[in-house]
């Protein structure tokens, strides 16, 4: 019987890397961020609703959602985030559910890559929850480098979510990402072996 696994963690914890590795191991990944982009893609009903609620400033010169404007708006005004979520979340759920069911019908184990799985109380929609663990200092360093944020802004984004320690306590399994990519791969392989998804780990070798 195929399993549905919820993959989550903190911001900049390494979810994209783990998803890529899991796809190599034969899992099918349903990506919440990708579904969210599809929900408001150019010409979509979702984007039309965003314009209606948030005005023309929410749309850039290319007719796409102005992500910088909307990102700043919802980060600084929680009530605006709720309004945006009310538009996007139902569309995202439909996209992800359709994709998940298609993979399950084909007999695949499915990874639901959902950054805010606990924040949106979605843990009961999956069979297991796997959390990618890293330290807050590593999260902040990655955010400052990747997103060109100040330390203050990086802290604000990290602390806007449930702490990674609390998420780890609520998880069925925790994937350690305190080291480099090779160590992450080894930790993931160990979990997959323990859970019977792969035959044996392949430590020390890169694909």
UniProtKB/Swiss-Prot annotation:
Protein function: Catalyzes the phosphorylation of the 3'-hydroxyl group of dephosphocoenzyme A to form coenzyme A.
Domain of life: Bacteria
Predominant place of localization: cytoplasm
Source organism of this protein record: Staphylococcus aureus (strain bovine RF122 / ET3-1)
Residues annotated for ATP binding in this entry: 12-17
An example molecular function term from Gene Ontology annotations: ATP binding
Known catalytic reactions: 3'-dephospho-CoA + ATP = ADP + CoA + H(+)
EC number of the protein: 2.7.1.24
UniProt cross-references to InterPro entries, sorted A to Z: Depp_CoAkinase, P-loop_NTPase
Domain DPCK: 4-203
Biological pathway: Cofactor biosynthesis; coenzyme A biosynthesis; CoA from (R)-pantothenate: step 5/5
Subcellular location: Cytoplasm
GO cellular component, one term: cytoplasm
The protein's name: Dephospho-CoA kinase
Disulfides per UniProt: none
Claim: ATP-binding is one of the keywords in the record: yes
Listed GO biological process terms: coenzyme A biosynthetic process
Keyword annotations from UniProtKB, A to Z: ATP-binding, Coenzyme A biosynthesis, Cytoplasm, Kinase, Nucleotide-binding, Transferase
